């Protein structure tokens, strides 16, 4: 689960780098073809995304929206492309179960029992290229930014219950 890396955080960065490279390859593009990278993860200072993007020689804007990071990157990216602020950019997000456990809950070596309401973070990464012109039939037509809705959920492990009211209000 470390993809040959020394830590889970570096493994997460490698996952995101792989997703970025795959999205560019599928689009027949190189990093130099991008005006901006919008990328995020669940780590402090978005270190996984920073490490995945640091050698791209492309402006980078770290995104931190927890579960909404990819949607946030796509929405912001779509607005930047539509406004003419960027011609082509890439949105990416990643997470790693083990690094999230260490940062948000309990380190795995601690051996603590999970609460029944605790969420399970995916070990995954995704990336998408957005541009005003391209060969894809897939496009963003609208974006909707939600607002925070606080109903006083006290269970710190039940992130789903904390996020659900805002999702319901938005949708």
Question: What is each PLM-predicted segment?
Answer:
Residues 39-40, 89-95:
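Short beta-strand segments
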Residues 44-49, 70, 98-101:
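Short active-site-adjacent helix-start/loop capping segments
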